[in-house]
């Protein structure tokens, strides 16, 4: 007895496009669940936080820019209260996990003591490993010294800890410096010290202050 093979129905070009869109939507959703949901301490409670569109877009653009060897400067502007801290945390996490970064060092630069403590609590809540707190100049020097510990991971510190450190302390290229309130922390001598001590690092500024299109704002990390 002969059975004729059944053929699958042909799929039109529009049908293929629809399947592609569905596949992309699934991939996008899975990636969102993996990369853009975090748990962090807020109002003394551990809460689930979902990054908003402006945050996810900023994270992706900063990571892509930081991994481009031709572009070592950048600036992210979030309006006050729009989640700049969590954008920084997720950027640090994805940079640290990126294979292209080759076991990097990521500096989270905070400008006030109370924000430094909050950043450490949030990093602990997110569950990130390889987090160090450089609360003293000597500790920062030890962590960064290319001839010494040459720490690979995330370092939370404040920019004034960079005073009195030697030039060319670490010349690796896979050092990423994420600077909170860059408009007021990178101007003057402290900013010069920072860039002299890490001459090949990538510097990404984060600010809640609008940037003038012509002057770029005094003390900010400029696009480059």
Please name every model-derived segment.
Residues 99-104, 131-134, 215-224:
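Flexible phosphate/Mg2+-sensing switch loops adjacent to catalytic phosphate-binding sites
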Residues 82-86, 114-118, 163-165, 184-187, ...:
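Flexible loop/turn segments at secondary-structure boundaries
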Residues 98-101, 147-149, 168-171, 195-200:
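Conserved catalytic network of the ASCE P-loop NTPase/AAA+ motor domain
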Residues 1, 171-224:
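Signature of the SF2 helicase/ATPase Hel1-core->accessory helical subdomain module
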Residues 113, 134-143, 158-164:
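Conserved helicase motor
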Residues 1-105, 110, 114-130, 153-154, ...:
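ATP-dependent helicase/translocase motor core
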Residues 138-155, 168-169:
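Conserved motor-coupling elements within RecA-like helicase/translocase cores
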């Amino acid at each position: 007895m002969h059975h004729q093979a059944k053929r699958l129905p042909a799929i039109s070009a529009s049908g293929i496009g629809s399947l592609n869109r569905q596949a992309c939507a699934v991939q996008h959703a899975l990636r969102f669940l993996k990369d853009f949901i975090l748990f962090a301490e807020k109002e003394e409670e551990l809460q689930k936080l979902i990054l908003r569109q402006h945050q996810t877009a900023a994270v992706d653009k900063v990571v892509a820019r930081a991994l481009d060897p031709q572009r070592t400067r950048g600036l992210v502007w979030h309006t006050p209260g729009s989640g700049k801290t969590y954008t920084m945390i997720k950027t640090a996490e994805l940079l640290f996990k990126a294979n292209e970064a080759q076991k990097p060092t990521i500096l989270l630069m905070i400008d006030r003591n109370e924000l430094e403590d909050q950043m450490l609590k949030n990093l602990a809540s997110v569950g990130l490993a390889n987090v160090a707190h450089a609360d003293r100049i000597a500790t920062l020097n030890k962590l960064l010294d290319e001839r010494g510990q040459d720490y690979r991971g995330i370092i939370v510190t404040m920019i004034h800890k960079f005073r009195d450190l030697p030039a060319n302390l670490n010349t690796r290229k896979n050092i990423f410096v994420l600077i909170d309130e860059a408009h007021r922390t990178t101007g003057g001598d402290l900013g010069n010290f920072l860039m002299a001590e890490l001459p090949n690092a990538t510097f990404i500024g984060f600010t809640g202050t609008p940037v003038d299109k012509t002057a770029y704002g005094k003390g900010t990390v400029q696009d480059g």
